[in-house]
Each structure stands twice: as structure tokens, then as C-alpha cells.
Amino acid sequence: MAQEMRYFSTRGGKETLSFEDAVLTGLAPNGGLYIPTHIPALPKDWKTKWAGLSFPELSHEILSLFVPTSVIPSDDLQSIINTAYSSFRSPATTPIRQTGDNEYVLELWHGPTWAFKDVALQFLGELFRYFLERRNKDKTEDMEELTVVGATSGDTGSAAIYGLRSKPSITIFILYPDGRVSPIQEAQMATVPDANVYCVAVEDSDFDTCQSIVKTLFSDAQFNATHRLGAINSINWARILAQIVYYFSAYFQLPEEARKDGAKLQFVVPTGNFGDILAGWYAKKLGLPMEQLVVATNENDILERFFRTGRYEADDAVQQDQTAETAAVNGSSDGQQAVSAVKATHSPAMDILLSSNFERLLYYLALETNGTEGSDEEKRFKAQERLNDWMSTLKKDGKVDLGEDVRQAAGKDFWAERVSDGQTLEEIQKYYRREKYGPYVVDPHTAVGLTAQERSAKKASPDTTWITLSTAHPAKFSGAVELALSASEFPDFDFRRDVLPDELKKLEGLEKRVHRVKGEEGVRALIEKVKSASHEKVDAEEGRGSL
């Protein structure tokens, strides 16, 4: 009999949780992230059985491996999935587009907010609704409620809001760094009028500050218990789970020649918080045929440095002596590498110093490099113990040397490339100039991925098929796109006419509601005020603005 899937914290403890409890809890009380007790096996005939399935049908097949029917009956799970993806504009949900010989882009931005976060957050929103409705069924008092608190560098916030707006028994607070999201991203969040939505601009902050506030609130046992906090950031396992699906979907959309036995396939993923690419790693471990996953970072390059050196460093101890050759590759002329603080770049969703989901991979790396002695439970305990040591050192010193054995273990599945701002703009121009596969306007994060793909292809077999994840519609990042394509060689380019969808144009002039606060105490005070007001709308700053 197959072992029923449960979930445990990366940082220790013998307790395991059901899928429902792991989703509703989000972050473990000890600060760890929930991961499955085992990675399940695919059906032997999955390549033929799943070929031709729609995205919702494929989602059901994959998610069923991680969600027991005792937690969500099969028909209910399919209904949740169908509702989650009913608002996507593409029949394929996440279609691929050919951009070169053996090169494809996986467009993940056909959901309601035009960003890849919709894939996971539409699903997570439906999960929250389903679990709370079931728990509150037949109750007339003491109804269970969820206070969702999340941080965003732009796209997570709007996707979470659209996934949770007007859902009963849920109040959502989205924190973002004041002045450091694009006008369209802020408009998508702040123009939603639903009474359960609160957009919180944290003054004098960056994304890491906002994310740190969220983690602190979740780690505060009393505050968490009082308000029943729920997580929508990629620390929530359900988000990783939903994202696994589009790696399989992309595979099945490839020409048959690219899917034959022995064919080489690589995915390239613009990477900030490590959730998107971690989903690809789980897909690989499940059995999806691929060589490596390419981590594409911008100038906030802590991940690229880890895969190159084995050191995970967030402080100013890292000063690299670049030769002329490495400077040319890394684009040092576009600014010093990020070490002591987050650098604002043209790809802001990747402007992250510490990647929260990297902890999940570190657990598996600890497990792999600890040796094979002991029972499964003993090996798990040793891995958790080692991970705790790493995280304690990182918290204390701002850096941790994970060792050459860990770096080599990671290198079996990952390769990393760092892309500068200047190279990002050049890539946007390059794809707009393309003739064979037509002009293609890409957002700056996709441009980072495409640059990394081109570099990686020079080191790989020429018959490799490449899929680069496109994480946002270019309209979401007008500043970088217009900067790249405003040159004299593109006199006919008009951003509003050529790129901006009508749905986003309609945001112009709509009333915005924003709550501006200072630091953690300001966030706490706002949540306390809202929850004590019995869900009456707490006044926000109101205003209108152009995009």
C-alpha cells in the first residue's frame, strides 16, 4: 500500500502535517518550510497517458500524487483546478512559443494579472476557499477565518489579491516597498475595491524588508494564533506544487522529435525567490526528462555566486576580483555586484538578497551529502540538524560556506548565469529585431532568462532543446521595455499601441487605496486595527494616477 503523503518542516520536529494543514499554516512554527515526506513516483505510462491532456487535467494527475483523496476527494480537486484556471486567456493556459531553432519560451502570463504568479495563486485562493468553507459548514458562530499576509516585489501582490478578492472568511494584507514597484503593478493592487483587500506600502524598505516582516509575524506564536495567519508567498507549499505542472505542460507541447527517448532538454528560469525553479527541480526528481535547470539572476547575484563558489553570502565580505574576461561576461560596467544591499535593477522581481525557497533545496542537499547510514528518519533528522546550523550561521554572520561537496551536489541539477542591466536591455532589443520568428517584445525578467539561455547554449550539446520561462507580460514593466526600445533605431515602436493590453489601459484613472506604514510596528498596528474593526474598511490614502 502506498504511503499517504504528509508534510514536515525543513528545520526539524517529528510532527508531520496533512496537505490541508501545511497549506493553511504556510510557515512552520520553528521557521522552517514544509516539504513532502517523499517524492512520489510517476505512473509508468505517464508519457502516453498524459499526452493530450488539457492543463487542468494534467494538473489533476500531478497534484493527485501529492494530495491524498482523504484530504481532497478527486472530483473536488478537479473542480478546484477547473475554477482556478477558468480565467486564463490561452486555451493552453501556459503556452509555449518558438523563438529560435530548438528554442522556446514558456509564456506563463496568460492569467488575470498577466504574470506567472497567477498559475499558483489562483489555485491557492481556491484551496483557501475550499478548506474554510468545509471547516465552517453548518456553523453559525466561531467561524474560522484566515488573515493572509504576504510580501511582494510587484507581481505576487496583484496575483494574490485577484486570487483572494471577495472570498469569504479571508482578509488579505499585501506588503510592498513604497515606490519600488511599477505603476501598473501598484495600480493592479490598489484599484481592487473589495473590502477584504489591504495594500500596504512599507516606507523606506525593499522587498527583503517586507518579506522579513512577514516571516517575523508568522514566527510570533501569539500574533499568529490570534489572527490565524495564512501565507501566499512561495513559502507556501501549494504554490510550488501548482508550478510543477507547467514544466510537464511545456514538455508535452514540444514537437515529438524533442520528446523522443534520449533527447536533451533544458529549462532556463529567471530566478529571485527560488520558488519557480524549485518547482522545476521537483519535476526533474519526479522523472521529467531534462538535463539541468539554468538559474538566471540579475545583478543581485547571491545564487549565481553560490553555484560557482559554494558560499551563500549576503554581506559585504564578498568582493570579487574580476578579470577583463569575467567583467565582460558579468557586465560589471553596469554596476557593482550586489553584496551588502539589494540593488534596484530593470528586473525588480529578482531584486532579492536572500531567496526564501532556497532553504528547501538546502535540506535536500544536506540529505544527499550526509551519507547513507541510518534509517530514513535518522537521515532526515541529521539533514534538519545540518540545515539548522547553516541557517543559524547565515542569520548570525550574513553568510555561510556550504562546502564543496554541497556545491557539487547542487551542480548536478543546476547551472547559474548572472545578467547585467545593460545586457537585459540589449536582449529586449535583440528579440524585437528578430525576423525569422518575428519581432517579440519580452519583459526584462524574460530577457534575463534569454541571455542566460544563449550563454548556456554555447556550453551545451547543439541538439539541446531550450525552454526559457517567461514570467510576465512586457506591459508589466514599461520602464525597461520603453527604455530599451526608445532608441532611434525603433522609431515606429509605440508602447501603448504595441504592448499595453486594453485590460491594463482600463486601470488608468481608477481610484487607488493604499495604506502607508513604517516598518514592522506599522504593519502590526494596521492588522490589529482592521481585525478589531470587525472587517469594516479602514480608511486608506486615496488617489488616481496614470500608468
UniProtKB/Swiss-Prot annotation:
- Recorded GO terms, molecular function? pyridoxal phosphate binding; threonine synthase activity
Q: Which GO terms describe its biological process?
A: threonine biosynthetic process
Instruction: Cite the InterPro entries for this sequence.
Output: Ser/Thr_deHydtase_PyrdxlP-BS (IPR000634), Thr_synth_N (IPR029144), Thr_synth_N_sf (IPR037158), Thr_synthase-like (IPR004450), Threonine_Synthase (IPR051166), TrpB-like_PALP (IPR001926), TrpB-like_PALP_sf (IPR036052)
Q: Which domain of life is it from?
A: Eukaryota
Its transmembrane ranges are none
Which UniProt keywords are listed?
Amino-acid biosynthesis, Lyase, Pyridoxal phosphate, Threonine biosynthesis
Q: What class of enzyme is it?
A: lyase
Which stretches are annotated as coiled coil?
A: none
EC nos: 4.2.3.1
Which pathway does this polypeptide act in?
Amino-acid biosynthesis; L-threonine biosynthesis; L-threonine from L-aspartate: step 5/5
Name positions with the PTM N6-(pyridoxal phosphate)lysine: K117
The protein's matches in SUPFAM superfamilies, at most eight in alphabetical order, are given as: Tryptophan synthase beta subunit-like PLP-dependent enzymes
- Similarity remark: Belongs to the threonine synthase family.
The record's annotation in PANTHER family points to: THREONINE SYNTHASE FAMILY MEMBER, THREONINE SYNTHASE-LIKE 2
Protein's job: Catalyzes the gamma-elimination of phosphate from L-phosphohomoserine and the beta-addition of water to produce L-threonine.
Identification of the protein by name: Threonine synthase
